[in-house]
């Protein structure tokens, strides 16, 4: 996935990456040139054959729904038969139940420690531990700075994060309380109005409207799998839908865009 590729780029390992897939957002700033030299096997799900065709020594995956017990790309056992080990991001397999398919259910809340573990694991695999610690320390400083900027929020504001919608006339995919967006909201002093443990539950606009979120955060992405992947489509929907358009957050212009990635 793109985010796993970014971690490898940050570790100075771009020359080790022979293929990448599952792209939702843009290339991480500063790594456009490095990424341009890496073959994109698919914007979404690559085939098993496309992955093994690159003859990798290691396959990294962000999500078990792609490479896992019932992975749409393949299973770890299939790769193991070819002598290819699989590394799965801790963010998708620690404290999380993916047995029901889809995006899974988090038993414990996401924390940045999962990302730090991923960085350190990959740094150890490629013997660049010092660089791994530099990346971890930089991310910690950036998070501390972000928290300091909004320390006054103190849970007074609430929010809903709208990722996308498979169709505009059905319930949207929104961020559950235990995933990465839920963690970000909590870190920034925002109350997530969605209380589901699912990673990306579908929740109706009528239900969302009843919670009256102070802010709507709309995901902006390059992917075009669903109509609402397009931020312009999201904006038009919020402005014209009979329910969404009368929500105070929409009427008062408290709709904000954020670039979506895949953790």
Where are these regions (language model features)?
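A local structural motif
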Residues: 30-39, 131-132, 187-197
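Basic- and aromatic-lined ligand-binding clefts that recognize polyanionic substrates
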Residues: 2-9, 131-188
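Extracytoplasmic strand-loop-helix segments at the start of, or within, the mature domains
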Residues: 1-25
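Structural recognition of the beta-strand scaffold that forms the well-ordered cores
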Residues: 1, 18-20, 59-62, 86-89, ...
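His/Asp/Glu-enriched short active-site or ligand-binding loop at hydrolase and phosphoryl-transfer sites
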Residues: 21, 26, 88, 175-200
């Amino acid at each position: 996935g793109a985010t796993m590729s970014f971690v490898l780029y940050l570790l100075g390992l771009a020359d080790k990456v022979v293929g990448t897939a599952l792209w939702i957002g843009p290339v991480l700033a500063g790594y456009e040139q490095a990424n341009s030299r890496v073959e994109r096997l698919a914007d979404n799900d690559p085939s098993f054959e496309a992955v093994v065709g690159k003859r990798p020594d290691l396959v990294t995956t962000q999500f078990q729904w792609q490479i896992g017990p019932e992975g749409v790309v393949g299973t770890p056992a299939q790769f193991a038969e070819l002598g290819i080990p699989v590394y799965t991001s801790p963010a998708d397999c620690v404290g999380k139940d993916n047995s029901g398919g889809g995006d899974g259910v988090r038993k414990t809340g996401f924390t940045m420690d999962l990302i730090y573990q991923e960085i350190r694991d990959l740094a150890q695999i490629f013997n660049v531990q010092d660089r791994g610690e530099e990346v971890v320390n930089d991310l910690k400083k950036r998070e501390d700075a972000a928290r300091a900027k909004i320390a006054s929020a103190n849970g007074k504001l609430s929010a809903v994060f709208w990722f996308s919608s498979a169709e505009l006339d059905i319930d949207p995919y929104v961020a559950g309380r235990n995933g990465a967006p839920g963690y970000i909201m909590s870190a920034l002093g925002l109350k997530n109005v969605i209380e589901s443990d699912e990673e990306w539950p579908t929740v109706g606009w009528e239900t969302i409207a009843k919670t009256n979120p102070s802010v709507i955060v709309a995901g902006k992405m390059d992917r075009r799998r669903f109509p609402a992947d397009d931020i312009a489509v999201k904006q038009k929907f919020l402005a014209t839908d009979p329910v969404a358009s009368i929500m105070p957050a929409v009427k008062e212009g408290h709709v904000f865009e954020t670039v979506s990635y895949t953790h």
